Curated annotation (Swiss-Prot):
GO molecular function, one term: four-way junction DNA binding
Gene3D superfamilies membership: 1.10.8.60, P-loop containing nucleotide triphosphate hydrolases, Winged helix-like DNA-binding domain superfamily/Winged helix DNA-binding domain
Residues making up the signal peptide according to the UniProt record: none
Domain text: Has 3 domains, the large (RuvB-L) and small ATPase (RuvB-S) domains and the C-terminal head (RuvB-H) domain. The head domain binds DNA, while the ATPase domains jointly bind ATP, ADP or are empty depending on the state of the subunit in the translocation cycle. During a single DNA translocation step the structure of each domain remains the same, but their relative positions change.
Binding-site residues, DNA: 292, 311, 316
Enzyme class, first EC level, given as a word: hydrolase
One GO BP: SOS response
InterPro entries according to UniProt: AAA+_ATPase, AAA_lid_4, DNA_helicase_Holl-junc_RuvB, P-loop_NTPase, RuvB-like_N, RuvB_C, WH-like_DNA-bd_sf, WH_DNA-bd_sf
Protein name: Holliday junction branch migration complex subunit RuvB
This protein's UniProt keywords: ATP-binding, Cytoplasm, DNA damage, DNA recombination, DNA repair, DNA-binding, Hydrolase, Nucleotide-binding
Positions with a binding annotation for ATP: 21-22, 63, 66-68, 172, 182, 219
Source organism of the structure: Caulobacter vibrioides (strain ATCC 19089 / CIP 103742 / CB 15) (Caulobacter crescentus)
Keyword Transport: no
Amino acid sequence: MTRVISGEPQHGDLAPADRALRPQTLAEFVGQEQAKGNLRVFIEAAKGRGEALDHVLLFGPPGLGKTTLAQIVARELGVNFRATSGPVLNKPGDLAAILTNLEANDVLFIDEIHRLSSNVEEILYPAMEDHVLDLVIGEGPSARSIRIDLAPFTLVAATTRAGMLATPLRDRFGIPIRLEFYTPAELRHVLQHAARKMGAPLTDDGADEIAKRARGTPRVAGRLLRRVRDFATADGADRIDRKAAAMALARLEVDESGLDSLDRRYLRAMIENYGGGPVGVETIAYAIAEARDAVEDVIEPYLMQQGFIQRTPRGRMACGKAYLHLGLTPPAAPPGQAQGALFDEG
């Protein structure tokens, strides 16, 4: 599912020009003030003691800077950075090869750690806790177990689905950090910084217009800025002001609340096909022809955070804000429910 407002990484996000926009230090990293403040303390303490930083779990919606923060942690510590991801670690040997090549206090970054297979996860436990690797060599009666000592290291893991982590794995992270959606003011700062590096003629009100439609996500803000710049160049505009940004975003079908055609299709299906809910995630995913994981990880987090939908024990329900956004009249509150509950943004 490729959407200009998706927080998931896309091919264009990996271009050298885009990587050059990423902050290199905690001081340059905009937003996530509490997370940055705590990380700064933990990093300085580890450096002062000459020890490896405790293991870090970064979790939250996609596009908020988990990978960038992991790289910054290694840079601030002054150690090597090695990156991999859960889906590519198919066998214990894959992870063992990485762990045995780490130097003292290095940072190992595992993205999408919730997708780590159970047999790989099991050898990670003693590695994280005791800095040892327990491997079984051979099969059957001739199989034998060997133990390999590892250099102390820091595992920085990222996930959009912390609830899927096994409790023993989750409990081994001494520094759990949740990343939150950005405010429009923070995104404006991100956009202005990116525009300067790109040489894009972005005005303050143009930055505000993009920021309010960027779904609280820096990755989305950067992608929208690049697309808006493309339209401005094609139209011969000498600057990207509010009017130019709004026109470009309208052509991209991104509305003033940051919703695109898929978001609106999701809300419309819930309201028109299922009376506003409650409806199960499998049902709504089938109705809009999208995978359940995409619905849960990409579509729903922002809709819930903005109060368009809510989860209940019986399924998803549309809030009053969703009806109004689509130009529809919200239904009356059912007997025994206060009218205000219909507009509950939980």
